[in-house]
């Protein structure tokens, strides 16, 4: 059997002669090195995104003023306040949580999150980054967490990542 690029006999099971086999191997190794460098660059970029999202989330969280509420004891199962009952002022509004959903979980960014143990699998598909990861010292204010999640989801969409914010009242 002859080489694909010349009339020399092939080397072993290769489709190239010894000279062209070495040349093809060098090209392949160079391609692998370029891919490795691109992957490392992409991973550094993802880490920078996490830092940026953390800063954006904290800024949005602090800039949001939740609607305060007053909680009071009721007379039985009605909305009528209990006479001489206790009442509490809640400056942070309703309690709840917020998170970012990234779909599909097979995207490069989602795989990087999985590898770095950031977030968890979403029940309905995709990958979740909870706001408590990006803002570790946050309160249970749902309005503040929602604001931070929306800001981070927009940042990811600007980076061409399919992401959206979700929340739940506690």
Model-derived features: positions:
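Acidic, low-complexity, intrinsically disordered interaction modules
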Residues: 122-132
């Amino acid at each position: 059997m002859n080489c694909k690029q010349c009339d020399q006999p092939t080397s072993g099971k290769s489709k190239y002669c010894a000279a062209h086999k070495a040349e093809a191997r060098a090209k392949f190794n160079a391609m692998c090195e370029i891919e490795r460098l691109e992957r490392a660059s992409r991973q550094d970029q993802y880490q920078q995104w996490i830092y940026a999202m953390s800063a954006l989330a904290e800024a949005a969280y602090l800039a949001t003023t939740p609607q305060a509420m007053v909680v009071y004891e009721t007379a039985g199962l009605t909305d009528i306040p209990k006479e001489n009952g206790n009442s509490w002022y809640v400056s942070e509004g309703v309690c709840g949580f917020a998170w970012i959903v990234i779909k599909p979980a097979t995207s490069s960014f989602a795989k990087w999150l999985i590898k770095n143990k950031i977030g968890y699998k979403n029940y309905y598909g995709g990958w979740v980054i909870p706001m408590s990861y990006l803002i570790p010292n946050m309160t249970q204010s749902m309005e503040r967490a929602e604001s931070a999640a929306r800001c981070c989801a927009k940042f990811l969409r600007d980076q061409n990542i399919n992401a959206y914010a979700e929340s739940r009242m506690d």
